């Protein structure tokens, strides 16, 4: 207790002086408590002293107990060791007896088996000498099993002697079997009734011998069977290509006539199968020798007949023996190339096709299961893995060039014929609006593909595919030649075409048919490549590509659509000339729309409905975009070709401009293709708004004309502004102050505009039309001159709308560039 606590305690016990009288009793009480505590402490100390002595005694007792326990454990361990020694002494004698018993048992068993082996070998020797094949086969199996037990005793002289004796017996059996089989096929089987049974029993002996004996016997039999074949067909009379079918008739007749006799062979030997393999190898060698040694080019008919019979024979072998790679039935796929069907018909046809294939596969699996169940392995050589397909026919591959040349000549001649007979029109009610020549062309190609598919799926098919490419390119060139030539205008400048194009209503329909036919050829050529890549050997699949052909047709589509635009431009030239001849400076009042506007409406009303009906939405969209991009700038530039405009004349021209704009905006509904209306309307409004803005500048007062021009044409140029002042009828002296003020404030850009760069109206002779007289030059033109445009259009490989948008963007952007592939093409 600290000092402060003691003071608090005293103050608490004696708060007043009167309470001090209780100090003495309190002191006595405390002293009594102290004495009691001291006595308690002393008692505890004494008790603790007595406890320490007790603990020492207990520890000593525990130590003695541990020592006694350790002594007892040692005694137990010693007794256990003694017991173990006694047990080992007892078991030592028992183990010796056990080993002795085991050795005696093994010796007795070995001696018994040795006795059996000696007896079996002696019996086998007797059976071999008597040619008792059936009994010898069973005995040989037993001897082989007994010999397996003596593998560990190979060095024992008696065992070595027995093995040598057994090998000699096996050689005797082998020689007897081979000797007996040499009489097979000589006619003795009819004289000796038991010969076939003896040979059948000898096959059991061969199975019991080493596998090499069976291989040697089968090979000898096949070689002996084919000896007469070699002698017959190596002679000068039958060693000809036109006698090939007789070779296969010989082996089929041989198998058919000897089918009962050859049943002596176990089914697991697959003797007819092995015979056919050797026959195919020998036939391939002979046929290849005939083809190589031919002095003259083979007649295609004979060559194809020999190849056809060879392929059919290989299919028969593959069907009979199996083991080939499963082939995909592509006849239906070839028929589907270039078909035009709606979705419901297409889905139904696909479903039926795959149901048919599934049923065929199920039937094949069931047949295979049934064959395995019945054990008829002669019909299906399970696990043989030998592919008869191409075993003989592949030797024809290097010599089929005449066939490919004939196919190419036939296809090219047919192409010339169908193009000459083409009416360049489509029957009413046709859904695809495709020229009959394109569908007929692919019909001929499909027939050619079917013919080749039955003959070859390797180099020959690949060479034929190259022929298809050349034929399709030739057709693309003919479509290209059919398009009208020449052209003028902005689109012509952008695409490198010069001269005007005059097209009639029939010409417009023909151009649309060419576009649709080129699109059909583009799509169908891709399907053709896919089908060929599926059926051709995988080594050639990577080379099956129709991208070049598709690019050719894409180029035809691009040029055809641009030609349509150029044709309408040519029709508009007359109306544009009428517009410049209107006396705009002397008009007295604003009336209805001018005659040239009605002329533009007549041109569009006569062409647009037909084009909208015949062209697909994608191509019609491209046509509209190019038409709008052509008419807008042409109309704008044509205003500058006019002479002086009075205020009334400018108001009339503004009314005409709005009428032309309305006419252009009505084109999608006129063509009944409203899906393109939104983007097209925005495009037309943008292009025609420039012409409206120009007329608003012309109508503005003299004192504000510069400000109005700068506001409406931030990119305007001084040259264009000066031309506007001339249209307003200002004299040179009056123009100068306005021009000085305009130049003082400065335009937004100094780049010369298209309208300012246009020459003054003057008669210009038409440029010579585009003409290509050489087909090779035409093909080069398609592949080279329009290659950039074709790639920009991205029409190849099915791309459509996106490609045309890219083409539009590229051509528009190229106008102001001084270099680059597009600019160089435009300047060509």
UniProtKB/Swiss-Prot annotation:
By its UniProt entry, which InterPro entries does this protein fall under? Vps53 (IPR039766), Vps53_C (IPR031745), Vps53_C_sf (IPR038260), Vps53_N (IPR007234)
Q: Which GO terms describe its biological process?
A: heat acclimation; plasma membrane organization; protein transport; response to heat; response to osmotic stress; retrograde transport, endosome to Golgi; retrograde vesicle-mediated transport, Golgi to endoplasmic reticulum
Coiled coil stretches, renumbered = 53-152
Main localisation = cytoplasm
Task: Look up keyword Transport and say if it applies.
Answer: yes
Q: What is the annotated tissue distribution of the protein whose record heads this document?
A: Present in pollen. Mostly expressed in vegetative tissues, including leaves, siliques, and stems, and flower buds, and, at lower levels, in roots and mature flowers.
**Pfam families associated with the record:** VPS53_C, Vps53_N
Any keyword Coiled coil?
A: yes
Where it sits in the cell: the answer is: Cytoplasm; Golgi apparatus membrane; Golgi apparatus, trans-Golgi network membrane; Endosome membrane
Q: What did gene disruption experiments reveal? A: Lethal when homozygous. In hemizygous plants, male-specific transmission defect.
Task: Identify the domain of life.
Answer: Eukaryota
Keyword list, A-Z: Coiled coil, Cytoplasm, Endosome, Golgi apparatus, Membrane, Protein transport, Transport
A single Gene Ontology CC annotation of this entry is: cytosol
Membrane topology per record: Peripheral membrane protein
Subunit composition and interactions: Component of the Golgi-associated retrograde protein (GARP) complex, composed by VPS52, VPS53 and VPS54. Interacts directly with VPS52 and VPS54.
Function of this protein? Acts as a component of the GARP complex that is involved in retrograde transport from early and late endosomes to the trans-Golgi network (TGN). The GARP complex facilitates tethering as well as SNARE complex assembly at the Golgi. Required for vesicle trafficking involved in plasma membrane protein composition. Probably involved in pollen tube elongation and other polar growth. Confers basal tolerance to long-term heat stress and osmotic stress, by acclimation of the plasma membrane.
Q: Which family does it belong to?
A: Belongs to the VPS53 family.
Name the record gives this protein? Vacuolar protein sorting-associated protein 53 A
């Amino acid at each position: 207790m600290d000092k402060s606590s003691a003071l608090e305690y005293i103050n608490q016990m004696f708060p007043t002086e009167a309470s001090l009288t209780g100090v003495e009793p309190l002191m006595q009480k405390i002293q009594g408590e102290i004495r009691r505590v001291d006595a308690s402490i002393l008692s505890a100390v004494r008790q603790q002293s007595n406890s320490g002595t007790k603990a020492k005694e207990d520890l000593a007792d525990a130590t003695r107990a541990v020592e006694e326990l350790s002594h007892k454990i040692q005694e137990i361990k010693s007794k256990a060791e003694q017991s173990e020694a006694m047990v080992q002494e007892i078991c030592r004698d028992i183990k010796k007896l056990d080993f002795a018993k085991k050795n005696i048992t093994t010796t007795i068993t070995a001696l018994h088996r040795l006795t059996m082996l000696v007896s079996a070998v002696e019996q086998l020797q007797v059976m071999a000498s008597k040619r008792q094949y059936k009994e010898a086969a069973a005995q040989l199996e037993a001897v082989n099993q007994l010999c397996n037990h003596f593998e560990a005793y190979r060095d024992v002289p008696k065992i070595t002697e027995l093995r040598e004796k057994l090998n000699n017996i096996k050689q005797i059996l082998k020689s007897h079997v081979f000797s007996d089989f040499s009489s097979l096929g000589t006619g003795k089987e009819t004289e000796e009734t038991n010969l076939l049974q003896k040979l059948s029993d000898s096959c059991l002996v061969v199975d019991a011998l080493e596998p090499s004996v069976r291989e040697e016997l089968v090979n000898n039999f096949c070689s002996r069977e084919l000896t007469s074949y070699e002698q017959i067909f190596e002679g000068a009379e039958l060693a000809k290509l036109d006698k090939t079918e007789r070779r296969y008739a010989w082996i089929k007749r041989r198998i058919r006539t000897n089918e009962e006799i050859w049943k002596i062979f176990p089914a697991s030997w697959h003797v007819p199968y092995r015979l056919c393999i050797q026959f195919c190898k020998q036939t391939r060698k002979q046929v290849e020798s005939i083809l190589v040694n031919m002095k003259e080019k083979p007649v295609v008919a004979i060559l194809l007949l020999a190849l056809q019979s060879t392929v059919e024979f290989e299919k028969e072998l593959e069907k009979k023996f199996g083991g080939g790679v499963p082939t995909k039935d592509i006849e239906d796929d070839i028929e589907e190339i270039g078909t035009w069907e709606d979705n419901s018909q297409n889905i139904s046809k696909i479903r039926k096709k795959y149901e048919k294939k599934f049923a065929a596969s199920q039937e094949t699996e069931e047949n295979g299961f049934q064959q395995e169940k019945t054990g008829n392995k002669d019909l299906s050589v399970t696990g043989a893995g030998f592919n008869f397909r191409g075993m003989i026919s592949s030797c024809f591959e290097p010599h089929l060039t005449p066939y490919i040349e004939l196919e190419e000549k036939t296809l090219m001649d047919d192409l010339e014929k169908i193009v000459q007979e083409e009416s360049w029109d489509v029957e009413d009610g046709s859904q695809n609006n495709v020229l009959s020549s394109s569908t007929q062309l692919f019909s001929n190609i499909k027939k050619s593909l079917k013919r080749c598919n039955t003959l070859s799926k390797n180099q020959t098919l690949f060479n034929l595919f190259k022929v298809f490419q050349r034929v399709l390119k030739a057709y693309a060139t003919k479509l290209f030649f059919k398009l009208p030539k020449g052209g003028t205008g902005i689109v012509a400048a952008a695409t490198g075409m010069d001269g005007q194009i005059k097209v009639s209503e029939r010409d417009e329909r023909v151009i649309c048919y060419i576009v649709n036919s080129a699109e059909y050829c583009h799509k169908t050529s891709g399907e053709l490549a896919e089908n060929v890549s599926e059926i051709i050997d995988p080594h050639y699949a990577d080379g099956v590509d129709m991208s070049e052909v598709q690019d050719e047709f894409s180029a035809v589509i691009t040029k055809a659509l641009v030609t349509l635009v150029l044709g309408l431009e040519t029709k508009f030239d007359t109306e544009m000339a009428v517009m410049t001849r209107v006396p705009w400076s002397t008009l007295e009042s604003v009336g209805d729309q001018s005659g040239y506007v009605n002329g533009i409406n007549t041109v569009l009303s006569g062409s647009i409905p037909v084009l909208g009906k015949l062209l697909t939405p994608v191509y019609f969209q491209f046509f509209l975009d190019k038409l709008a991009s052509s008419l807008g700038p042409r109309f704008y530039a044509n205003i500058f070709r006019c002479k002086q405009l009075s205020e009334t004349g400018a108001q009339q021209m503004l009314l005409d401009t709005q009428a032309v704009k309305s006419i252009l905006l009505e084109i999608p509904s006129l063509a009944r293709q409203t899906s393109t209306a939104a983007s097209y309307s925005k495009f037309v409004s943008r292009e025609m708004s420039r012409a409206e803005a120009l007329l608003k500048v012309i109508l503005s007062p003299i004192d504000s004309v510069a400000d109005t021009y700068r506001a409406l044409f931030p990119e305007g140029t001084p040259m264009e502004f000066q031309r506007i002042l001339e249209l307003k009828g200002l004299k040179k002296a009056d123009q100068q102050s306005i021009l000085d003020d305009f130049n003082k404030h400065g335009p937004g850009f100094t780049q010369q505009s298209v309208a300012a760069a246009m020459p003054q109206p003057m008669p210009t002779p038409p440029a010579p039309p585009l003409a290509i007289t050489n087909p090779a030059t035409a093909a080069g033109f398609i592949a080279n001159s329009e290659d950039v445009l074709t790639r920009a259009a991205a029409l190849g490989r099915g791309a459509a709308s996106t490609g045309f948008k890219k083409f539009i963007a590229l051509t528009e952007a190229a106008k102001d560039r001084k270099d680059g592939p597009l600019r160089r093409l435009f300047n060509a």
